[in-house]
């Protein structure tokens, strides 16, 4: 039996009572990575100091009250870590070693968690399959011929494969929730502004959020409790007080009002996914929740809106990678050629595609027709969510339209690839929180149930997700 099967709460008791050493947990993580990561490809680098750090922590473990003390965590490689490479899955930052930790990493270290290593991802978080990493693709632990989802594919796969107890990912249009669904783990995108973005390498600043991926809802709540809260270093950080989200895990959802958008069961959603989500809805009803069908009519504009806005923000954010200050630097005689050749050599095809799309949308002749119109559509999408959530506690539906697809199956069709995020993108545009929890299998591959909540009401999302998890069994470890 893996020590990680105990979860945060039980592991804390075992460590505090001296029945399990922190060094044993770290060693188990490294041993598991050594055994299975050759098949999965979840890690890009490992923390060479982790074991020595764990041995020092063994000596003080019995005095520590924080539930995360001594527990191993993986960090997505677009979240900066002091003294460890942060590549963003790109050759451009192959040798970049930050001088400071991101706020979320700092808070986890203060809580006693140990960073085991940095996790693979789509380059600069641009992708839905984790095939866009400049180093290696990540494979789904449930079936290594299939993708794990993206862009936080390494974060989801590492948890699903039992390499770490939990991980951090980032979510711009579904990049935590979609991989969580594909890999059968729990993944939360918090309300925009709840978790500091300081130290997250920006893709689309008005959409990006850091969040936790875990085996269970309870572990997820522990992790969010540690990283949420105001940060002076992030101008978009909300003025919210720290919260213990585990207090919401009552197992009782009697009277919970649930909305189910009819648009989330339309064309493009596989029958297997629909069947599993309808079964999940019936389960929630049997637990005492009330369910009504609603409409989010402007969701049909979400995909186009997102790719215009996110690409526009990316073209601006990635302008900083110029071959001068850090990262790849091409040899050239003229300064303009240094910029041009450095970016040509350092960026992959998908990143170049989105930079070009964003630059086009922001150009003077097309700004009103594309970028401005997309901002107007975003307002309509947000209004839809505000209206529904004024009358309901949560909105539920599938996380992804299909289970994980095979590696290489959509590489030549960017539009089909983009459509994999059609059910997660609206949530980022609205800025509301959402979680994906395991909700069955289709042909041996996991399906995710997405639970969407009101701004800064992660507690109700956790309450609903936890009750569903208790009733259905939740996480299962795939056979590797």
UniProtKB/Swiss-Prot annotation:
The keyword Nucleotide-binding applies. GO terms for cellular component: glutamyl-tRNA(Gln) amidotransferase complex. It catalyses: L-glutamyl-tRNA(Gln) + L-glutamine + ATP + H2O = L-glutaminyl-tRNA(Gln) + L-glutamate + ADP + phosphate + H(+). InterPro entries: Amidase, Amidase_CS, Amidase_dom, AS_sf, GatA. GO terms for molecular function: ATP binding; glutaminyl-tRNA synthase (glutamine-hydrolyzing) activity. It comes from the Bacteria. Keywords: ATP-binding, Ligase, Nucleotide-binding, Protein biosynthesis. Its EC number is 6.3.5.7. The active site is at residues 76, 151, 175. Allows the formation of correctly charged Gln-tRNA(Gln) through the transamidation of misacylated Glu-tRNA(Gln) in organisms which lack glutaminyl-tRNA synthetase. The reaction takes place in the presence of glutamine and ATP through an activated gamma-phospho-Glu-tRNA(Gln). Heterotrimer of A, B and C subunits. This is Glutamyl-tRNA(Gln) amidotransferase subunit A.
């Amino acid at each position: 039996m893996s020590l990680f099967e105990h979860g945060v709460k039980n592991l804390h008791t075992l460590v505090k009572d001296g029945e399990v050493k922190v060094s044993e947990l770290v060693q188990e993580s490294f041993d598991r990575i050594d055994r299975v990561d050759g098949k999965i490809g979840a890690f890009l680098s490992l923390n060479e100091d982790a074991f020595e750090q764990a041995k020092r922590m063994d000596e003080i473990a019995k005095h520590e009250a924080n539930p995360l003390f001594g527990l191993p965590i993986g960090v997505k490689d677009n979240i900066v870590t002091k003294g460890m490479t942060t590549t963003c899955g790109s050759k451009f930052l192959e040798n970049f070693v930050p001088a400071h930790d991101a706020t979320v990493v700092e808070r986890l270290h203060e809580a006693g968690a140990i960073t085991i290593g940095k996790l693979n991802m789509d380059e600069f978080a641009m992708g839905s399959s984790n095939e866009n990493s400049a180093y290696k693709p990540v494979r789904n632990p449930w079936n290594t011929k299939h993708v794990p989802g993206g862009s936080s594919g390494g974060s989801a796969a590492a948890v699903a494969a039992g390499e770490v107890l939990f991980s951090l990912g980032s979510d711009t249009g579904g990049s935590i929730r979609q991989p969580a669904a594909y890999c059968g783990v729990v993944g939360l995108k918090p309300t925009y502004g709840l978790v500091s973005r300081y130290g997250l390498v920006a893709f689309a600043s008005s959409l990006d959020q850091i969040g936790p991926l875990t085996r269970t809802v309870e572990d997820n709540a522990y992790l969010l409790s540690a990283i949420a809260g105001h940060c002076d270093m992030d101008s978009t950080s909300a003025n919210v007080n720290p919260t213990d989200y585990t207090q919401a895990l009552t197992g009782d959802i009697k009277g919970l009002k649930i909305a189910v958008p009819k648009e989330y069961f339309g064309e493009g959603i596989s029958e297997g996914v629909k069947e599993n989500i309808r079964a999940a809805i019936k389960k929630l009803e049997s637990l005492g929740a009330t369910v009504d069908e609603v409409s989010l009519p402007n969701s049909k504009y979400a995909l186009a809106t997102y790719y215009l806005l996110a690409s526009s923000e990316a073209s601006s954010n990635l302008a900083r990678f110029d071959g001068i200050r850090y990262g790849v630097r091409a040899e050239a005689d003229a300064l303009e050629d240094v910029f041009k050749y450095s970016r040509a050599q350092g960026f992959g095809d998908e990143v170049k595609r989105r930079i070009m799309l964003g630059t086009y949308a922001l150009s003077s002749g097309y700004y009103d027709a594309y970028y401005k119109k997309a901002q107007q559509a975003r307002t309509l999408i947000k209004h839809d969510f505000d209206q529904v959530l004024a009358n309901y506690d949560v909105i539920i539906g599938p996380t992804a339209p299909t289970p994980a697809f095979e590696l290489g199956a959509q590489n030549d069709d960017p539009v089909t690839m983009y459509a994999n995020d059609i059910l997660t993108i609206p949530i980022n545009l609205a800025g509301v929180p959402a979680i994906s929890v395991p909700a069955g299998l289709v042909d041996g591959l996991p399906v995710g149930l997405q639970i969407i909540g009101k701004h800064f009401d992660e507690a109700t999302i956790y309450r609903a997700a936890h009750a569903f998890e208790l009733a259905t069994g939740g996480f299962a470890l795939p056979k590797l």
